Amino acid sequence: MRKHTLSVIVITKNEEDRIETCLKSVVDIANELIVLDSGSTDATVEICQKYTDNVTITDWPGFGKQKQRALDKATCDWVLSIDADEALDKEMSDALVELLKQDQIKHTAYKLPWGVTLYGTTLKHGRSARAVLRLFKREGSRYTLDEVHETVVPEQGSTGVLKGFLLHYTHRDYGHGLDKAAQYAWLGSQKYHRKGKKSHGLFLALLRAIWTFFLVYIIRRGFMDGSVGFIMAMTYAQVNFNKYVGLWILENRSDDRSNDQAK
């Protein structure tokens, strides 16, 4: 018998090809399943309504604000935040059920090891060799309001790691991967610019890209994931390069405007 209740929160837009896998992996675990959709034009909403009545259509304020909206709707003891292109594997699902049965849960938050599934391969190294904080006590937790790469700030306490994998079906195909990488790079450029971060020039952008490839492919052993591991290391290097190039362009555009105003 479970001693703790669980809210699962998901944000969606045009995810009809992936959302059902996500919802199937959590529907039997969740005490409440909360979906916020930001204007899907495909069958995403209809699919979600097969699994929960708690589906809300909203505008799109950015990732952080949308996740916070979903969190504000949660009422259970614990919250699992899962993306539409993710799903719990069986080991993680079972581990979560066992956790909620405990009288006293040791930690206030848990990281979930990522298993990026790409081009038919589930990667276990490289960028996937990390765990993301997605399970946390609801009381006292909040999201940062960043437009991209938002993070949850849980109630003060220790953080554990849940067994199993959070499967991440990150790219529909290579073209989708390129589009997604470009979007995240540009959003990252704008985020850094708003926060006053400096690019320190294009040569440093190149060095950052080289370091990213070395980190993902060598230090985190992306080479052990074969050809797909190489593709992923190159993709992340390109994203980091584009992010700082975008920041450099924004800096120079701001400088040009300041000079024009001073004339």
Segments and roles (model prediction):
Residues 1-25, 256-257:
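N-proximal low-complexity "stem/linker" segments adjacent to membrane-targeting elements
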Residues 17-20, 42-51, 91-92:
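Acidic helix N-cap motif at the loop->helix transition within catalytic regions
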Residues 29, 50-52, 131, 155:
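Short, structured coil segments at secondary-structure junctions
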Residues 31, 53, 77, 85, ...:
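Conserved acidic residues
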Residues 31, 45-73:
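Conserved donor nucleotide-binding strand/loop of the catalytic core
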Residues 65-71, 78, 82, 89-253, ...:
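Catalytic-site signature of metal-activated, phosphate-bearing donor transferases
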